[in-house]
């Protein structure tokens, strides 16, 4: 109506501009006709035009008071003599205005008439379409209400105060679903008795438009009774014209219907309003067009209420879950934990669900862009995925943006809302219906979107071997056996293994039952040290004899049958005195069984003085090898002494060095250590060392083979090199150990005779074999002692030969051989140098 009034105002303005030239034409013509007769007057006396030139918004200035006209001059008519010749003045005929002024006026009138006709035509067409949509929505509402009455038993309708008021449900009891149409004139939403939901047939596309409360008072109801959702309240704050848009202004209890299962943003996202919300009647807003300030105030009040209701709904319900378009109507509803216990919401089946929902999102207000953009992105992704997949819409970010945009208007109108809320009488709250048992909560899938690729999925048996095997292709490192025979058997040091309790990897000892502490059948006892037991186990694996054979060889004293290695292993695993007592105390009839290694040692303990026998037999078996080693060492030292005394070449080198080193030539001797410094001392010519000049003289005297003779000195004194590697103190220690071992063997025989085992047959064999050994051992020891004395005498003689005091070198008797070894290395280097120079010459 405002637009129509604006068009009519423009038409009248055009008409006034068109007729204004005619009004200006009549006074001009009048003045032209009476120019000769009328007196000259002031131009201010003319009357203003009919349509003033002032703006329509400001009133014209008041007219000036009329001024009195001056009295006309008296004129007397003079008549000539010939009165017949008198010509009386006649007024000419009025001339019609020019045709050029009529053409614009006629065209302006025609244009105004055309605009008026077009305005009435479009207005009538708009009224016709609106009434047609109202009829369809009313018929659809009646059909759906009949179908609901037939399918679902409903309780009696609730009482409403007025027809034009919105029926409001409690926020905690009812939740509206798609497919239900609730008008203000009808009863409120009815909760079905059964939680099962029956699908509805497809609905026409045009039923998405809003239903208004009456046809007679359409304009007044649009201005007075506006029901706001969070989306509609935003639109109402922007402009008054946006409030008329049916897509942006939606009631909380009106469900939009279309052939799409997806909800419109305004209907789906509007929260259930509280039953205590104020009802606004038509009488409160009858003067809203004439009072724009009140309209803005009402809009802010509605926006604040819808904001509070939307924030409460968002906290109670959380994130709504909307399923994508499918053939089942149950997949297109919002599912929340409270919705299952309260009511059901139906959604229609659509053949093109995404296209219509995108149109609705495009027509939404700009402040809902966050939510629209979120829903569009989900619909675009749902087209590529399976239609039966579920997806979630996150409206937390949209609610935050809406809250930030609404906080400032709420702060400005806080006092107005408080005064308005105090003035409105609130109806008593309705009793909520009994709650139904809640089903188990739905667990969202871990992956909201999943694209199914064409192809057969491989089972676990069909997977490639590389997926399960991992690193089986790598070659495993070869494990080496742990040398347990190198572990000391009688270690008295405490370490980490000794501090750990036995079987510490099991459960706590306090939690064990009493049966675990009792001895069980075939339970092995751990008497020996773990390391010692492991050594015995390794020995048994390498043993080629049985336990009885080993015991018999120990009784008879046959050390050849056992061997040195076996005897050494038995000597290392000798148990301590406590372990021997424990092993002897065990009997064969005992419930607790011994380990194989402990059983082996227990059988060995049946032999008297078994481990002393082992030591004695080990000494007997290794005696010959030790004697041979000592004899070889003594013979090498004696041969080295003879070689040093009888070497002609060594004597020539020492004499030539003595002559070249002393300028006077009267030197008689020098210390043997001086041979090592001949390389560093220059000769008389000052160009070469003394050793170089001595070797050169020897080669010249011997001829061509002289250099080769000097080099062969190293091979002649080879025994001296070997003697230098020996340690005379170690040799003498080995001799003393050998003598002690023989003494231990004789002690074993003495112990056996004292204990009374000498009459036994087994002991007699052992004693016979040991006595024979002692006889041969005594003779060999005497020989070793004689060789040791002769060797010591030869070393002292050769030391004195090279002018070394043997008393000072008693700690290092073999030092002479060490000096000779080092001198031979220097001599070989000089010979190689001379060969190189001779070859170049």
Swiss-Prot record:
Subcellular location: Membrane
Keyword Ribosomal protein: no
PROSITE patterns membership: FH2
Domain of life: Eukaryota
Signal peptide (from-to): 1-25
Keyword Heme recorded: no
Biased composition (Low complexity): 254-278
Compositionally biased spans, kind Polar residues: 139-152, 279-293, 502-512
UniProt GO cellular component terms: membrane
Major localization listed first in the record, in broad terms: membrane
InterPro entries: FH2_Formin, FH2_Formin_sf, Formin-like_plant
Protein family (similarity comment): Belongs to the formin-like family. Class-I subfamily.
Chain's role: Might be involved in the organization and polarity of the actin cytoskeleton.
Classification via PANTHER family: FORMIN-LIKE PROTEIN 10, FORMIN-RELATED
Name of the protein this chain belongs to: Formin-like protein 10
Organism: Arabidopsis thaliana
Name of the gene this protein is made from: FH10
């Amino acid at each position: 109506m405002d637009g129509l009034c604006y068009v009519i105002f423009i038409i009248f303005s055009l008409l006034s501009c068109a007729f204004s030239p005619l009004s200006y034409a009549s006074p001009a013509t009048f003045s032209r006709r009476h120019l000769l007769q009328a007196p000259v007057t002031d131009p201010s006396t003319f009357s203003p035009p009919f349509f003033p030139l002032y703006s329509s918004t400001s009133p014209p200035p008041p007219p000036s008071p009329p001024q009195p006209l001056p009295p006309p001059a008296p004129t007397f008519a003079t008549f000539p003599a010939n009165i017949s010749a008198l010509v009386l003045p006649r007024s000419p005929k009025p001339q019609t205005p020019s045709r050029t002024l009529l053409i614009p006026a006629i065209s302006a009138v025609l244009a105004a008439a055309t605009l008026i006709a077009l305005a009435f035509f479009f207005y009538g067409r708009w009224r016709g379409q609106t009434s047609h949509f109202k009829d369809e929505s009313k018929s659809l509402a009646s059909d759906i209400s009949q179908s609901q009455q037939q399918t679902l038993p409903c309780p009696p309708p609730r009482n409403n105060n007025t027809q034009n008021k919105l029926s409001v449900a409690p926020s905690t009891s009812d939740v509206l679903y798609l497919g239900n149409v609730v008008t203000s004139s009808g009863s409120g939403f009815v909760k079905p008795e059964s939680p099962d939901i029956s699908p509805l047939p497809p609905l026409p596309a045009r039923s998405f438009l809003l239903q208004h409360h009456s046809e007679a008072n359409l304009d007044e109801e649009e201005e007075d009774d506006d029901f706001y959702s969070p989306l509609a309240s935003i639109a109402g704050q922007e402009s008054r014209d946006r409030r008329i848009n049916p897509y942006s202004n939606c009631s909380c209890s009106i469900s939009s219907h279309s052939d799409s299962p997806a909800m419109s943003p305004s209907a789906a996202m509007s929260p259930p309003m509280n039953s205590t919300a104020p009802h606004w009647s038509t009488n409160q807003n009858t003067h809203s067009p004439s009072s724009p300030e009140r309209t803005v105030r009402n809009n802010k009040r509605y926006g604040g209420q819808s904001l509070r209701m939307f924030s409460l709904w968002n906290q109670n319900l959380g994130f709504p879950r909307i399923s994508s378009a499918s053939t089942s109507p149950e997949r297109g509803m919002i599912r929340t934990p409270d919705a299952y216990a309260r009511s059901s919401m139906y959604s229609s089946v659509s053949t093109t669900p995404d296209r219509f929902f995108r149109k609705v999102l495009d027509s939404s207000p700009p402040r809902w862009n966050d939510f629209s953009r979120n829903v569009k992105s989900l619909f675009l992704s749902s087209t590529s995925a399976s239609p039966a997949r579920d997806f979630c819409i996150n409206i937390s970010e949209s609610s935050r943006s809406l809250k930030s945009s609404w906080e400032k208007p709420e702060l400005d109108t806080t006092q107005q809302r408080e005064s308005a809320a105090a003035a409105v009488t609130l109806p008593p709250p309705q009793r909520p219906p009994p709650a139904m048992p809640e089903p188990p909560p739905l667990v969202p899938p871990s992956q909201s979107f999943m694209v199914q690729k064409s192809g057969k999925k491989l089972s676990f048996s069909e997977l490639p071997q590389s997926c399960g095997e991992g690193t089986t292709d790598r070659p495993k490192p070869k494990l080496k056996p742990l040398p347990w025979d190198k572990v000391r058997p009688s270690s008295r040091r405490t370490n980490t293994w000794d501090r750990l309790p036995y079987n510490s990897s099991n459960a706590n000892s306090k939690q064990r039952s009493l049966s675990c502490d009792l001895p069980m059948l075939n339970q092995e006892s751990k008497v020996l040290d773990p390391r010692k037991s492991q050594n015995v186990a390794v020995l048994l694996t390498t043993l080629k004899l049985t336990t009885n054979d080993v015991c018999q060889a120990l009784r008879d004293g046959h050390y050849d049958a056992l061997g040195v290695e076996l005897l050494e292993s038995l000597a290392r695993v000798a148990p301590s005195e406590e372990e021997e007592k424990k092993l002897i105390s065990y009997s064969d009839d005992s419930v607790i069984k011994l380990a194989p290694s402990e059983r082996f040692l227990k059988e060995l303990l049946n032999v008297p003085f078994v481990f002393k026998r082992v030591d004695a037999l080990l000494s007997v078996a290794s005696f010959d090898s030790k004697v041979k080693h000592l004899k070889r060492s003594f013979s090498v030292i004696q041969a080295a002494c003879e070689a040093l005394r009888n070497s002609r070449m060594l004597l020539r080198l020492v004499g030539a060095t003595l002559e070249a080193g002393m300028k006077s030539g009267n030197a008689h001797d020098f210390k043997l250590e001086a041979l090592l410094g001949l390389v560093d001392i220059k000769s008389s010519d000052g160009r070469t060392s003394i050793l170089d000049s001595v070797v050169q003289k020897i080669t010249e005297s011997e001829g061509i083979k002289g250099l080769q003779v000097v080099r062969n000195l190293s091979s002649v004194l080879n025994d001296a090199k070997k003697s230098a590697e020996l340690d005379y103190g170690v040799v003498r220690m080995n001799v003393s150990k050998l003598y002690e071992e023989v003494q231990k063997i004789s002690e074993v025989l003495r112990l056996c005779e004292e204990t009374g085992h000498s009459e036994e047959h087994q002991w007699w064999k052992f004693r016979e074999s040991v006595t024979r050994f002692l006889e041969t051992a005594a003779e060999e020891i005497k020989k070793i002692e004689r060789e040791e004395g002769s060797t010591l005498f030869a070393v002292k003689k050769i030391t004195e030969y090279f002018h070394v005091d043997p008393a000072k070198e008693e700690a290092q008797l073999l030092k002479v051989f060490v000096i000779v070894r080092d001198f031979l290395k220097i001599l070989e280097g000089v010979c190689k140098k001379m060969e190189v120079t001779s070859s170049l010459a």
